[in-house]
């Protein structure tokens, strides 16, 4: 039986790969997509998500979400993904539009209609998820678990300690981590290992139309290089759903720093139990890199 999922995203070049896997992995049933401001503005992430759905002729409803963090001024990652968020490929024109309700209500309504609890996957800042949990607490029993790409047990990628998706809205992440729902965190500890090699990248133009499109996007992606390999951060959240055997997880207490002058956005991961607090997150700490690369090749071959 396919696993029903809702995907909250901020495309973003590596988001595009994760969306492809969510659509084409035969084990998954992608039922709803929502967008959030993150890599670029929410208007751009929504446009990019609609372009991808049209490219794959995927009839999946999409709702636009939060334009700004809960408290802070927005920050973006245009230096990594380009000003549009998906520079490098000319998508054809289309007339698709997002749903007429915001992401918060789209997720709430879809959860309440679902015949069984649904897995939420968040690969951008956690603003939409925090709004859902705080404004619609009646939805909690309908959430099977939340799988996120975000955080780190060690160093960061936008500050010395903080990973971008958490740092973009620390207050939202803190709300989510305190919520009591089951959380799997695929952070930089594994995503920095999730590298597509130059040899594989060079085969993409011959793979299929998705390979050609991704190869064009990758030429503008700044999380690594085509010569040294590219890190597929967001794809790890989808990979865990399909191949959890590739990941080493440890239950840990995780808190989000929201006050520190130099540490705001840091996920404080208590690996050794020093704080004596109960674990609230399953933290991915290691990855079978070869197995991950093989799985990526298999799923992208299906993305025609």
UniProtKB/Swiss-Prot annotation:
The keyword Hydrolase applies. One of its GO terms (biological process) is pyrimidine nucleobase metabolic process. GO terms for cellular component: cytosol. Keywords: Glycosidase, Hydrolase. The active site is at residue 233. GO terms for molecular function: purine nucleosidase activity; uridine nucleosidase activity. SUPFAM superfamilies: Nucleoside hydrolase. The keyword Repeat does not apply. Its EC number is 3.2.-.-. PROSITE patterns: IUNH. Belongs to the IUNH family. RihC subfamily. Hydrolyzes both purine and pyrimidine ribonucleosides with a broad-substrate specificity. NCBIfam families: PRK10768.1 (NF008036). This is Non-specific ribonucleoside hydrolase RihC. It comes from Escherichia coli (strain SE11).
């Amino acid at each position: 039986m396919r696993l029903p999922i809702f995907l909250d995203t901020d495309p973003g070049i590596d988001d595009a790969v994760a969306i492809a896997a969510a659509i084409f992995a035969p084990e998954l049933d992608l039922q709803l997509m929502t967008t959030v401001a993150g890599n670029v503005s929410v208007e751009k992430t929504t446009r990019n998500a609609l372009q991808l759905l049209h490219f794959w002729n995927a009839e999946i409803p999409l709702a636009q979400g939060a334009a700004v963090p809960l408290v802070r001024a927005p920050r973006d990652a245009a230096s990594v993904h380009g000003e549009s968020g998906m520079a490098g490929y000319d998508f054809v024109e289309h007339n698709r539009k997002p749903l007429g309700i915001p992401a918060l209500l789209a997720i709430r309504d879809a959860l309440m209609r679902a015949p069984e609890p649904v897995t939420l996957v968040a690969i951008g800042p956690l603003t939409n998820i925090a709004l859902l949990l705080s404004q619609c607490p009646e939805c909690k029993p309908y959430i099977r678990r939340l799988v996120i790409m975000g955080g780190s047990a060690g160093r960061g990628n936008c500050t010395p300690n903080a990973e971008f998706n958490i740092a973009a809205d620390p207050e939202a992440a803190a709300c989510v981590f305190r919520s009591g729902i089951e959380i799997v965190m695929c952070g930089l500890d594994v995503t920095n290992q999730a590298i597509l090699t130059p040899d594989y990248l060079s085969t993409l133009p011959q793979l299929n139309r998705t390979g050609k499109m991704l190869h064009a996007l990758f030429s503008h992606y700044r999380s690594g290089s085509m010569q040294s390999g590219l890190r597929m951060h967001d794809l790890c959240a989808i990979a865990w759903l399909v191949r959890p055997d590739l990941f080493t997880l440890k239950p840990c207490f995780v808190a989000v720093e929201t006050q520190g002058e130099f540490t705001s956005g840091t996920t404080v991961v208590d690996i050794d139990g020093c704080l004596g607090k109960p674990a609230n997150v399953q933290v991915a700490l290691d990855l079978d890199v070869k197995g991950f690369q093989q799985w990526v090749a298999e799923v992208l071959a299906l993305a025609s």
